[in-house]
């Protein structure tokens, strides 16, 4: 018997999302206009809370859909205007270009990145050294590339290796279902569980590595570029200004990586079983024999393009998004990717998040029009200049651990810049606050998958169920990093940021706008 029209509409609305989630969103959409009529300020804060809720529930439904509905309603009922949304989007065009073109550009360098991580995995026998190598490699790559892409590459390596061993363990060949363990021989099951633990720890080290490297440069994370643009910094300026906080945090993060592996704390410490290593090494040897001269030239070309990418970013030869576009053109032209559909696949990863970021800017427009953060900013600005840095760092960190750090960073840098333009703070203080905001949004956000897009990508990937990586387990494994990164970042913001910045300015390394 066919279902009713009403039931059919209900099932279509937000698709497979739970009924309670659909109902919650409908309640939001119904009550918002009435609350806005009664008290626009309260309605604005309610909208922000609802939007953060959709980000926190990203596993139930991709936030673009519910967040987009809330944003559309906000424009319709007058919380902001379509013209203001357009202005916010136009002001952040560089960030949108970064997401569209840089992420797509790195897609065409995946073969090189896969080659690097595969060599690391099979060449290094010490688990501690291997974990450190994965963390450092992810940090370095994320400083110049998109963190999502770096994590995607590591996921590809892990899924590939897991599938190779699972086929051997189940004796099912090409018909093997990686999610089905029913055909695994009993003596292989223990080895498989150890292999899962090994992959889980490597994925978490790599994920944290992207956060450690991503905070250091203006292209490491989308919000970095927003903050850099607001402060008028180029690539070198940004790196130097962040370094009093980010360099000590990087060192302590790497020490944490070694410590948890050595002590086998928080689910770390599993080694690669020898049986698995033998199978993977055999497969890699066969793959290397099959590699043609054409394949080798592709790897060389991608490496050269990587050098161009780093050089162009460091010397600021063009806007970041345009450098990404040049990578797309060079990588496709020189490696023989000429089919439109093959090129189109590169954009599937970035465009949903680009659309979501545009929705972020709609909510930011509401925050500006309704002056939602005015009381918080006034409270912070009443404190001493030294205390302001700590408060901005903590407020950013708290929000970023439960919400998306791009959203949080955008809000706070806009408010800080408005305070500077109104004469509430000096330019020098604004530049220090920009560092506190950037580090505050990036470092504590490793606490949960909600804050770091790369972590959320890992949690929702095909790999997560294979290696038994759940939301709770991810939070638990991230906990030592969360504590160390947050505390060291806070101490550096409080004690080393201002004097180190002053020293670099006097040494002529930094130029302050006047």
Swiss-Prot record:
| Family annotation (Pfam families) | NhaB
This enzyme catalyses:
2 Na(+)(in) + 3 H(+)(out) = 2 Na(+)(out) + 3 H(+)(in)
> In the UniProt record, does the keyword Cell inner membrane occur?
yes
Keywords, sorted A to Z? Antiport, Cell inner membrane, Cell membrane, Ion transport, Membrane, Sodium, Sodium transport, Transmembrane, Transmembrane helix, Transport
Give the UniProt subcellular location, in the record's own words.
Cell inner membrane
Q: How does it sit in the membrane?
A: Multi-pass membrane protein
Which molecular function GO terms apply here?
sodium:proton antiporter activity
Q: What sections of the protein cross the membrane?
A: 23-43, 63-83, 97-117, 120-140, 144-164, 202-222, 238-258, 303-323, 357-377, 391-411, 447-467, 475-495
GO cellular component, as recorded: plasma membrane
Q: Does the keyword section mention Cell inner membrane?
A: yes
Role = Na(+)/H(+) antiporter that extrudes sodium in exchange for external protons.
Q: Identify its protein family.
A: Belongs to the NhaB Na(+)/H(+) (TC 2.A.34) antiporter family.
Q: What is this protein called?
A: Na(+)/H(+) antiporter NhaB
Specify the species.
Answer: Salmonella agona (strain SL483)
From the UniProt record, report the name of the gene that encodes this protein: nhaB
